[in-house]
Structure formats: structure tokens, C-alpha cells
Amino acid sequence: KLWRMTGTWLGGFCHSIIQIPVIIQLPFCGPNVIDHYFRDLQPLFKLACTDTFMEGVIVLAFSGLFSVFSFLILVSSYIVILVNLRN
């Protein structure tokens, strides 16, 4: 059970570590006010003084990869449960 918790924490850590270099390289200028408290990347992209299309694509691609990976782990665990119930 500890490996599941560790895997979840490591997955979240890796997801964040991948997004940090994307945000650090953005040039920010002008008003620096975000009107909510959520830790989202889209409001930061709006504050950037450059075109953030490619950064958005990178973040979307990695988020999609992690979502698909999590879904596959979930489906595989259900398959194991169903196989064990059948036997």
C-alpha cells in the first residue's frame, strides 16, 4: 500500500517538475494581479509578455500523458480484480 502512495506523490512531483522550466522562462511585464487563488498555469500565461501557445501545448501534452498513464494504471488494477474474482 505504501508503494501506491509513493507512486502518487512521485507522479505529482514529476508533473510539477516538468512544468516549472516552462514557467520560469516566460517574461512577465505589466500588471501582475491574478484574480483568484487557484494554482493554474493559464492565468500565468495571460500575464506573460510573449506568445504562450507552444508552452500551452507542452503543458497540455504532458498533462494528457499523465492522465492516460493514470487511466491505464486504474484500468489494469480493475482487470486484475476481475480476473481474481473470476478465478
Swiss-Prot record:
Keywords: Cell membrane, G-protein coupled receptor, Membrane, Olfaction, Receptor, Sensory transduction, Transducer, Transmembrane, Transmembrane helix. It is found in: Cell membrane. Its main location: membrane. Residues 1-8, 77-87 are cytoplasmic. One of its GO terms (biological process) is sensory perception of smell. It is a multi-pass membrane protein. One of its GO terms (molecular function) is G protein-coupled receptor activity. Residues 30-55 are extracellular. The chain crosses the membrane at residues 9-29, 56-76. One of its GO terms (cellular component) is plasma membrane. The keyword Nucleotidyltransferase does not apply. It comes from the Eukaryota. InterPro entries: Olfactory_Receptors. The keyword Disulfide bond does not apply. Odorant receptor. Belongs to the G-protein coupled receptor 1 family. PANTHER family: OLFACTORY RECEPTOR (PTHR48002). This is Olfactory receptor-like protein HbT2.
